[in-house]
């Protein structure tokens, strides 16, 4: 039996399905373009050329570049948050923080374009921050901050500020994943897997030192 909500919903047409497909295609292309050029460097001409759409077609789905960029940032947040909230948050605070770190590393490895978008947004959004109604990744960072605050509440961080530790670790992960080619060249290690293993081990060793060797 159809629910009242279903009865009140207009039937899905072929045109609306095609529109959804075009919108998704545009968003997928926009992810690549924004990852490469950032918000400031991505023009409608570049976006349209990559997507095979006219400026008018892009404006049909997104009335401005800001709206398109906001939709891309929302997809980045949704992707990261979906995996984050699926983590097992049982156990002691140190173990919860370790799981979060492992997830951040794995997510970044699987979503390199999203990591590039995040890094570019951090660099470019300084002037927009005072006027932003909602910051990118705000919900996810709040979830992570809670884990670090719980860790601090155990007394094992001493004088270390839990929020600053969160951003030191998260920032190091993002920078490493974005700057891998440069880091690889500087340290003379072209093997991504070997370099990532060393980086992961270093992050966890640093956390153990902060937590008191746990």
Identify the residue ranges that each predicted region occupies.
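Hydrophobic alpha-helical connector segments
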Residues: 85-116, 154, 162-169, 200
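Helix-turn-helix
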Residues: 22-25, 29, 33-67, 71
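Amphipathic alpha-helical linker/stalk segments
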Residues: 70-99, 147
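Solvent-exposed, non-membrane alpha-helical residues enriched in polar/charged side chains
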Residues: 23, 31, 35, 70, ...
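C-terminal peripheral helix-coil segments that are non-catalytic and often amphipathic
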Residues: 1-10, 106, 110, 138-154, ...
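Amphipathic alpha-helical segments used for helix-helix packing
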Residues: 109-131, 179-187
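A contiguous binding-surface segment within folded domains or other stable secondary-structure elements
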Residues: 119-149
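Amphipathic, non-transmembrane alpha-helical scaffold segments
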Residues: 27, 69, 73, 77, ...
């Amino acid at each position: 039996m159809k629910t009242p909500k279903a009865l009140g919903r207009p039937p899905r047409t072929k045109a609306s399905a095609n529109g959804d497909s075009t919108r998704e295609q545009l968003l997928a292309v926009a992810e690549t373009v924004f990852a490469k050029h950032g918000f400031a460097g991505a023009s409608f001409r570049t976006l349209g050329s990559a997507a095979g759409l006219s400026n008018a077609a892009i404006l049909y789905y997104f009335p401005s570049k800001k709206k398109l960029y906001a939709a891309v940032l929302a997809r980045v947040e949704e992707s990261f948050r979906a995996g984050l909230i699926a983590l097992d948050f049982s156990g002691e605070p140190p173990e919860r923080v370790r799981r979060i770190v492992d997830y951040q590393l794995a997510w970044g490895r699987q979503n390199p374009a999203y990591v590039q978008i995040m890094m570019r947004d951090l660099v470019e959004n300084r002037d927009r921050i005072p006027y932003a109604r909602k910051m990118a990744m705000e919900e996810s960072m709040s979830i992570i901050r809670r884990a670090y605050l719980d860790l601090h509440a155990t007394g094992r961080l001493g004088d270390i500020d839990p929020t600053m530790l969160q951003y030191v670790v998260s920032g190091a992960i993002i920078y490493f994943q974005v700057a891998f080619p440069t880091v690889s060249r500087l340290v003379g290690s072209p093997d991504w897997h070997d370099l990532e293993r060393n980086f992961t081990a270093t992050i966890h060793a640093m956390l153990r030192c902060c937590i008191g060797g746990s």
